[in-house]
């Protein structure tokens, strides 16, 4: 297809074109681009394509700042100026709430953009692999590398291939320096990188966590099958400790399984502490190697402030915090509430929530672990009291119908619904509409250069 004009943005960071009533989804283009398209997949009502030639570039186009753009699979909206990114995210929220929710809405507040659009993440995970991914350009030029080992990110659709990352713009540059130093040391001393198909090799993954307190955690994960490999591994860790004295938590994990999950594995301290801290309004949140914490610390604070403001707390309320995670929101609003009860599926997260309450001398929170639809029942409410306010922050799939039914039974005065998926949020708002009216909507951009958007909605009992 020749000289097709890109019309709009779509889900998953792609853009839309239309040819003879056929809707076409195209990645890495922006509205206003005029391109030739090559169809990759065709369905009855839509097709997926890629741009193979640009005839005109949109005036609303930015130059990508990352050398890995278009290959690593992340930051797909680098080609859009940030002002355009947040405009489309605002539109995404409005479209979802109106098209799917079909409910009466107030005026939607302007999106809260991120002050940082680069180096805004506090956590990144990198993968080692003995199969370096070669870009199309490298293949065309028949580039030969002395090293086919790589450390970086998985290529979308090719789990055993890893794109060698020289510089990632998502996390503080210390992350790049540590990763590249480990890579170079491993090259120089002939360490083996994992083969993701056969599971042979030593170095597997590394995780870097930074924090607003200036603390720095590095976790190196390896496979050890022979005794001498442990000695080699500790030599690598000593090199990291000597080279980067600013690391406050240098940890390691032995993973001899066939998958990369670490939740069921022991974490060992090589140097420093087994945790770092995040801070927010004088509260300290302990973050361990397996802990969940919002990956954009500064915007997380803004998000939580919106949730607290919408909750309208005076100090007398019983608050339920559903899908509480490690209890960050629950502990954050506890000073303005009579009591906060947090419920979360993951037992380890609930233990973190209790620890964080103890660290901050918070005595008016209770935390329970269990599946939400099994925990939040009429009996639970009869036992613990009817909530005045419910704050809910469910996963992308939204809330289970049973959970919504119990919320309707409980009839809190206000519901604050925090969502990372405005589409499922809109569906749930429609289900709550029989008793609740939407009073305020506040989108928040947590992830610049991606299509993801958070949205906070205040509902009040009719």
Question: Across the structure, where does each feature detected by a protein language model lie?
Answer:
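Rossmann-like S-adenosyl-L-methionine
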Residues: 3, 11-13, 227-462
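Short, acidic/hydrophobic/Gly-rich beta-strand patch recurrent on exposed beta strands
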Residues: 15-20, 152-155, 219-221, 353
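Short, aliphatic-rich beta-strand segments
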Residues: 208, 214-223, 284-288
């Amino acid at each position: 297809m020749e000289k097709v004009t890109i019309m709009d943005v779509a889900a998953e960071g792609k853009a839309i074109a239309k040819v003879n009533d056929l809707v076409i989804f195209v990645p890495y283009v922006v509205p206003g681009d005029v391109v030739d398209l090559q169809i990759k997949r065709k369905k009855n009502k839509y097709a997926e394509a890629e741009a193979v030639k640009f005839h005109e570039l949109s005036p609303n186009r930015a130059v990508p700042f990352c050398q890995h753009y278009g290959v690593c699979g992340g930051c797909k909206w680098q080609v859009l100026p940030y002002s355009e990114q947040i405009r489309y995210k605002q539109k995404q929220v409005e479209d979802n709430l109106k098209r799917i929710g079909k409910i009466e809405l107030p005026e939607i507040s302007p999106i809260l953009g991120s002050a940082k659009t680069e180096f805004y993440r506090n956590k990144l995970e990198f993968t080692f692999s003995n199969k370096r991914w070669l870009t199309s350009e490298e293949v065309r030029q028949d580039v030969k590398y002395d090293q086919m080992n790589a450390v970086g990110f998985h290529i979308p659709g090719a789990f055993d291939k890893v794109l060698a990352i020289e510089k990632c713009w998502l996390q503080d540059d210390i992350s790049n320096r540590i990763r590249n130093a480990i890579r170079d040391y491993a090259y120089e001393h002939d360490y083996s990188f994992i083969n993701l198909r056969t599971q042979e090799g030593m170095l597997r993954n590394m995780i870097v966590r930074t924090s607003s307190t200036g603390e720095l955690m590095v976790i190196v994960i390896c496979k050890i099958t022979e005794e001498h490999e442990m000695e080699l591994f500790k030599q690598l860790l000593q090199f990291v400790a000597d080279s980067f004295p600013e690391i406050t938590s240098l940890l390691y994990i032995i993973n001899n399984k066939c998958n990369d999950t670490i939740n069921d594995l022991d974490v060992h301290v090589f140097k420093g502490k087994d945790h770092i801290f995040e801070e927010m309004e004088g509260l300290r949140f302990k973050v361990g190697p397996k802990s969940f914490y919002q990956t954009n610390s500064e915007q997380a604070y803004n998000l939580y402030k919106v949730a607290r403001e919408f909750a309208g707390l005076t100090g007398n309320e019983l608050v339920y915090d559903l899908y509480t995670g490690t209890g960050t929101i629950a502990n954050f609003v506890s000073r303005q509430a009579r009591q906060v009860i947090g419920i979360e599926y993951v037992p380890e997260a609930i233990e973190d929530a209790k620890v964080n309450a103890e660290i901050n001398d918070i005595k008016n929170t209770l935390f329970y672990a269990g599946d939400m639809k099994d925990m939040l029942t009429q009996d639970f409410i009869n036992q613990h009291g009817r909530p005045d306010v419910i704050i809910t922050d469910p996963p992308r799939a939204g809330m289970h119908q049973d959970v919504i039914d119990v919320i309707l039974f409980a009839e809190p005065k206000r519901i604050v619904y925090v969502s990372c998926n405005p589409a499922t949020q809109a569906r749930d708002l429609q289900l709550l509409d029989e008793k609740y009216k939407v009073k305020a909507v506040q989108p928040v951009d947590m992830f610049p250069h991606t299509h993801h958007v958070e949205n906070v909605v205040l509902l009040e009992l009719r």
